[in-house]
Amino acid sequence: MKAKQIAIIGASYLQLPLIEKAKEMGYTTHVFAWAADDVGEKEADYFYPISIVEKDKILEKCREIGICGICSIASDLASITVNYVANALSLPGNSMETALKSTNKHEMRKAFEAAGDPSPKSILVTDPDAADCLDVVFPVIVKPTDRSGSRGIFKIERKEDLKSAILSAMESGFEHKALVEEYVDGKEYSVEFISYHGEHHFLAMTLKYTTGAPNFIETGHLEPAPVDEGTLYSVINVVRHALDTLGITDGASHSEIKISEDGTIKIIEIGGRMGGDCIGSDLVRLSTGYDYVRMVIQVACGIEPDFEKVCPPHPAGCRFIFSQADIDELSKIQKEDPDKIIKVVDYHPEMIGHITDSSNRAGCYIFRV
């Protein structure tokens, strides 16, 4: 019997669980990314040194291979290419309009506003000099329209700092545009769903910890989030409606929200892909028993996702390494309570002192709660 061929976009440590799971499921893996000696290059059955943004080159190769599905996890940029190729080859995926709305925060905000989804008010800025003319109430959040991973995000408390923040955000983005949006107070959460033929299945809600202002780099996650049933019910309904607004029909989604003290829910953003930072690849499976990565592969290949639990659910967390104190804490746990640590991921202690956003943290460890 001929092996099933699947394309995977990206080769970093974030994609490693996807590559490994696809091989475990009997697929031959064809991985596309620029050559950077990443772990996915070595794990793939076939690796192609093509940048993930070179959609037409990837499409040409995938057509030649005869893939039965294409997917990626934890990458907004990769999700554009995934849907481009899927649409061209009549494979399962979301429309290119949906890909735009779920990766460009301005288009997302417009869609949410038109559909009545609760989301911060925002203003699109294409010229930093416009800062002097903006009628906003401080504090505000400034961010690029098309980046993720806490890149180029600032909380600005006064007008004097607004222009420089806009300039920095624009320089961080691919299309060099920025959003200035109202600051939403409250606890941060993310919500994982898997969608199949337009039906959205809730998987998990995660409590998120960050460095706070000004850059909000994520420092850790806890799953399941400690919220009451009423709050969870409201969150699920809000997110389901927003997924329909964006047109997400197939595959994973990662929704970031804030909940204020009075229970008001605001959608910060939604990505048409699995949550990164080990949320989708590890925490969902540990805390719910569901194999989220397997579901992503199944949906990408036109197969209904399997909700059979693969392990007993147990609360789990992820903590990121920023400092020597974090390394010392990890060493202490490994010595005093080694069974608590499930694994250490992407450990690069040489990055301590050089961390600017989520992409260059010094690693993380996943633990039992």
Where on the chain are the PLM-derived regions?
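Glycine-rich phosphate/pyrophosphate-binding beta-alpha loops
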Residues: 150, 271-287, 347-350
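Phosphate-binding core of ATP-grasp and ATP-grasp-like enzymes
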Residues: 169-177, 182-225, 233-266, 271-280, ...
